[in-house]
Amino acid sequence: MPLFPTDLPEREWCQFNAEGFSRRVCGLIHRGTNAPLCGMPLGGIDTGCLDLEATGVWGYCSMFNSLNPRRGAINEPFLGASVGKQTWVLSTVALSRREGQEWIDTMRSWANYRAVKSASDIHYWGHFPVADLEYETDAPLSIGMRAWAPFIPGDVALTNAPAAVFEVHLRNSTETEQKGTLAFSFPGPNEGEAGTTAFRRVKIEGAATGVSVESPQASYVLTAIGESSVRTGGCLGTDAVAWSCIEDTLPFVEAGAGTSIAVDFALSPGAEKTIRFVLAWFAPVWNGGGIMTGKGQDYRHMYARRYANARAVAEMITGRHEEILRRIIAWQSVLYGDEGYPVWLRDALVNVLHLIPETSIWAQAKPPVGDWCNEEDGVFGMNESPRACPQIECIPCSFYGNFPLVYFFPEAALSTLRAYKAYQYPSGQAPWVFGGCTVGSPPYEMAMPSPGYAKKPQTTLDGGCYVDMVDRMWRRTGDDQLLREFYDSVKRNTIFTMNLRPGSGAAGIVSMPEGNQAQDWFESCDLFGIVPHIGGVHLAQIRMARRMAKAVGDEEFVRQCDSWLAQGSEVLENETWAGTHYLLFKEKETGKESDIIMSYVFDGEWMAKLHGLEGVFRPDRVKTMLETIRRTAIAMSPFGSVVFCKPEGALGKEDWDPGYWGAHGVHPPGTFMLAMTYLFYGEKDTGLDLARRTMGEIVKRGWYWDVPVAIDGTAPRIGFDYYQNLVLWSFPAVMEGADIAAPCKEGGLVDRVIKAGSEA
């Protein structure tokens, strides 16, 4: 039986039965002949990853610390099967070397090796961290593969293991015995990653058989579990001749980086066999410059604190592979089986977690990390967009995207918060990044914090992000000791943020900083004076800070927060309400004013309500403007909500410059937050449909495992692997009709996912 039905529609969410699952799953199928831009990555937290393409080749690779620029796409096939001297390379991409040529090996008694064949198609179901593939060939066997990485919500140590397993299912549906060979190929690290072209190769025997390929900077192990007839050799790559003779020989290798491993098999009629390959890697040090030859500082991966080397990882996986896969299926089954969520959202909640291996990095508490850092914490960070805007912990990105970390890996989220606190400036200002491209430092630095852009930084919103993330952790854990640890930092930032425009009196609470020398999250456009989007975020920050002050008994600051709330709210409502919507901005000092609609104006409302607090705008006006947004910004996009528009239609060039958002740009994370705001106000169908159409467009365009930050702005897409999209994991709290902590309580979705993954 195949791992999943192969006759399902392409790129359409549906439910179906699948191998190992007791109930129907939710998912969508891609195909190798119409492949997505990137396949699903294999990896965990801080491990780097290797993209497994729907075409049956390796894609981008960061496992050996080619972080920026990424190595790849490698575009080499990795799996092939041979029966009767006929090899099928299991990829829809034809080999470039000697394709279509037969040849005779005179050294093997004139053995005739037939021209290699490729797969005519591949059916591909990604359900991170698992990718299931079914291959279409004319071979006398049917072949499927389940590839997976150890990613278990709630188990940070196991999810920190740099490894992947490839389970290849061979099925003989003929009436005769089929003998042959299955071969797996891996290129290993390149010279820049390894720092050498000479590798030590050590044979591995025991519960698994294969080879360890070692260098000072990068090593890996490739083995087959429980097989007696195993051969190893050099990388097969794109060499059709090498693939064609895998039944008899593999490429000679003495000290090279690449490896192939072959397992011989014999299947009686109707028989099936599963051959399991383990790939474990170990590249303990990365350079903040993004590549190992970069000019940044060196950091040591947290996984190197847990595991001694690649062989230790491989041995652990070999001994526990059945348990780990069972646990993965168990936690996924909780999501797939919860009929309170629409099918598309169940699948998206599973697959959006792929952004964690694509963007996460975790430094040990060793120099250049300061001595403020606890050994057990290290410094965990996410990279905004490794291939487009590489920088660590851009604070609004984590504001959008750290929900699954808070829920499933709070150790990592707390590590990040402690770094933000350590890097906070004496003024109370929060750091913008830990290091990276927008501030002129290398792209993977963890200890080069900066307040932001040299001109017009996002300072006015950075504090709201920081306070929100602290409140998230407090609400999720219920730990008042954590609150006490961060309270002074939160208070100092809130005071700093509310005094960025002291010359405007009460209006300064909900305005741009003095001189308008700042940017909104929706950057690259000019805003002036009172800005409802910024004001709403400020008021949400104050509400959170007030609750914290109340909890620690700081009544004086409670009164200060009450004063800010009353004054700021009065200014927003009296100065910027235009009857059907809030203005984009209004600067009383100069008379500058814009009637343009910003469809994501209610981000602060979403923040407050998600945290179980009273909203920050008048509820009746929120409802009125949500209706305005529906007939304008949402109506103008076939799949989302445009960021900016006029009350009567699209922006013209003469109206105002929206920067790279253009007249039709959509921000997927912002659209998801807007969708949840509709849910907060009782419009569940509207909100879920809006979010579904946005995610559906991402799927349609082949970006499911390569999600952008902007669609149809000044370019069809802006950004790759944007972890802001992890904001999807705030949907469970909204769907459960409660605050951010609700999914963690007994019987909540997060609670059930963690328990299933630990108990299976």
Question: What are these model-predicted stretches?
Answer:
Residues 157-159, 163-167, 232-234, 240-247, ...:
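The feature captures the catalytic groove of carbohydrate-active enzymes
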Residues 59, 65-73, 78, 82-92, ...:
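Non-catalytic C-terminal accessory modules of carbohydrate-active enzymes
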Residues 118-132, 140, 201-249, 333-372, ...:
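Active-site acid/base region of carbohydrate-active enzymes
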Residues 1-97:
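Beta-strand-rich N-terminal accessory domains
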Residues 1-24, 29-30, 38, 132, ...:
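Acidic/polar, glycine-enriched structural segments that form the non-catalytic walls/loops
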Residues 77-106, 172, 299-324, 387-512, ...:
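Aromatic-rich carbohydrate-recognition surfaces in CAZymes
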Residues 394-425, 463-465, 472, 476, ...:
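Active-site core of glycosidic bond-cleaving carbohydrate-active enzymes
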Residues 50-54, 59-65, 91, 155-158, ...:
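Short, solvent-exposed loop/turn and secondary-structure capping segments
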